[in-house]
């Protein structure tokens, strides 16, 4: 659920991150070169529990390290267990007994190639060999098992906008960007001839019938397949108009967003451009959806719930933008989760930050447990712990997926932003928690996101944060900190009719416990929470199950 822009601003000013304690007043990482995160982790792993965890992990570690999934390298150095995330475009490879990040090895799910005489398919984000008795044949950049016959190649791109340099509106001119990871189908009349996928640069090659016919066409779909052959995530037009209360029943003609061109036009000029007037905003949403799907798979080694994102131009929703793990059968298949995105004049579909925020809720629902504590919430206004945890995680996931600390959106004709690194909003003041009000105090969701952002930046890998979300302690009710879900409503910008239920719910403190119980460095935790002046999390005494 998006937060609302509100004139009710609360805050204590901006407080900045400081290093954890060392000897006396000296930070624990004082001797480390700037940017040397591995040195910081060695120097600041200052508790018996952390050392014991490292010793256990290192006793099982191959001498040259190992890959954890596609994007994380694990190794031990001087008895300290370390992890590092590979940069975008790189994957973890194990060669000659050594695990490392290799540049240029990432690929788009479903793309094929010929390599070393063999046929390879991109599976789970990396190239995997496949049996091919007929021999691999390369045609226009795509690998085929055997001769493919007649093919057509091209490139797909779409028009998109983003925030302008001042973050006051969308860019006045759209730019054309590659449409990577989109499904591409070749048809003769209604008969499917071939189905492929665009690579990271938007390039595709598909089989076509011999001889060009007027009924031949190429269709690009805003849809993706997981590791199988079934479409598992897509952007769809709900075939509705006006405002609707969620969860809304899609119209009978609801369909996955697609764009069609004649084969003949692409033979003459093999560039498939999706323009704004054709709904390129849906293509932009799919780009964000694909990023979230890939991030989820890389971090957890498994796919999330099959999800559809509803975007209809001129269609709005009672929640603004929101997510729910509510199943629906529509647009040709059953989906286990839905995202509703507004199609009004704010053109918020251009906000990759907002779309990925909603998909952060999808990640939590797919791999963790949601607090199910919903309701209106406003920038700068502390809310209840369950909602703050859910919304804060979603905003952090958006930041992590984009590699940016700045969240941005447009509502009611107003563009606004929040910077997690600086703890600074574009409007009003930042609200900080108070150490005297305990772990279950109301807390502003962006403060939760800022804490998570610092936790992620304090180590060379964000993998511990994703693992903590899926930890058994975060998925077993009741939760250790004892928080109970609340219900309330808003009246004139104020919380009224607050009611505590008997339903347990997870909150930020439970998540921090899960992190610490897995051996997370105390110094990094304290630097993020600042317990003496802000959130009073006791890193020395986590509740472990």
Feature annotation, model-predicted:
Residues 159-189:
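Short, ordered, surface-exposed loop/turn motifs in non-cytosolic proteins
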Residues 353-370, 391-395, 399:
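Active-site recognition of the HExxH zinc-binding catalytic motif
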Residues 339-355:
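Short pre-active-site segment immediately N-terminal to the catalytic Zn-binding motif
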Residues 207-209, 273-308:
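Zn2+-dependent metallopeptidase catalytic core
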Residues 24-148:
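Cysteine-rich, disulfide-bonded extracellular modules and peptides in secreted proteins
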Residues 311-338, 349-350:
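Catalytic zinc-binding patch centered on the HExxH motif and its immediate surroundings
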Residues 187-207:
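Short, acidic Ser/Thr/Gly-rich low-complexity loop/linker segments typical of extracellular
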């Amino acid at each position: 659920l998006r937060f609302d822009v509100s004139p009710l601003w609360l805050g204590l000013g901006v407080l900045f991150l400081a290093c954890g304690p060392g000897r006396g007043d000296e930070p624990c990482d004082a001797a480390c070169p700037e940017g040397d995160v591995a040195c910081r982790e060695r120097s600041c792993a200052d508790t018996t529990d952390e050392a014991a965890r490292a010793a256990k992990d290192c006793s099982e570690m191959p001498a040259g390290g190992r890959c954890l999934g596609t994007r994380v390298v694990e190794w031990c150095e001087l008895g300290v267990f370390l992890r590092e995330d590979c940069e975008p475009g790189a994957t973890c490879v194990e060669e000659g007994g050594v695990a490392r990040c290799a540049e240029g090895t990432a690929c788009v799910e479903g793309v094929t190639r010929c390599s070393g005489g063999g046929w390879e398919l991109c599976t789970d984000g990396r190239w995997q060999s496949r049996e091919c008795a007929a021999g691999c044949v390369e045609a226009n950049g795509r690998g085929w098992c055997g001769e493919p016959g007649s093919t057509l190649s091209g490139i797909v791109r779409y028009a998109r906008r983003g925030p302008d340099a001042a973050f006051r509106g969308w860019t006045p001119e759209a730019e054309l960007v590659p449409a990577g990871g989109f499904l591409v189908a070749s048809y003769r009349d209604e008969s499917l001839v071939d189905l492929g996928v665009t690579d990271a640069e938007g390039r595709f090659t598909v089989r076509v019938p011999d001889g060009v016919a007027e009924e031949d066409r190429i269709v690009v779909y805003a849809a993706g397949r997981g590791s199988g052959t079934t479409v598992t995530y897509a952007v769809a037009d709900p075939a509705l108009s006006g405002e609707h209360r969620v969860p809304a029943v899609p119209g009978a003609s609801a369909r996955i967003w697609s764009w069609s061109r004649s084969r003949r036009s692409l033979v003459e000029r093999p560039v498939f451009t999706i323009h704004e007037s054709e709904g390129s905003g849906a293509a932009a949403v799919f780009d964000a959806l694909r990023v979230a799907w890939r991030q989820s798979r890389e971090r957890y080694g498994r796919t999330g719930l099959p999800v559809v994102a509803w975007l209809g131009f001129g269609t709005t929703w009672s929640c603004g933008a929101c997510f729910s793990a509510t199943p629906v059968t529509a647009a040709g298949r059953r989906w286990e989760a839905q995202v509703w995105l507004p199609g009004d004049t704010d053109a918020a579909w251009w906000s990759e930050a907002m779309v990925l925020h909603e998909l952060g809720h999808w990640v939590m629902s797919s791999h963790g447990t949601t607090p199910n504590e919903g309701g209106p919430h406003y920038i700068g206004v502390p809310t209840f712990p369950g909602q703050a945890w859910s919304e804060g995680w979603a905003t952090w996931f958006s930041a992590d997926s984009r590699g940016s600390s700045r969240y941005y959106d447009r509502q009611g004709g107003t563009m606004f932003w929040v910077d997690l690194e600086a703890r600074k909003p574009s409007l009003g003041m930042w609200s900080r928690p108070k150490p005297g009000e305990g772990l279950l105090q109301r807390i502003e969701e962006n403060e939760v996101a800022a804490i998570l952002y610092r936790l992620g930046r304090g180590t060379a890998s964000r993998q511990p944060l994703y693992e903590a979300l899926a930890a058994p302690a975060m998925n077993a009710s009741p939760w250790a900190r004892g928080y109970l879900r609340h219900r309330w409503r808003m009246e004139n910008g104020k919380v009224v009719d607050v009611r505590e239920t008997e339903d347990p719910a997870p909150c930020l403190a439970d998540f921090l416990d899960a992190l610490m119980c897995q051996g997370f460095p105390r110094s990094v935790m304290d630097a993020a929470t600042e317990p003496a002046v802000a959130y009073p999390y006791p890193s020395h005494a986590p509740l472990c199950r």
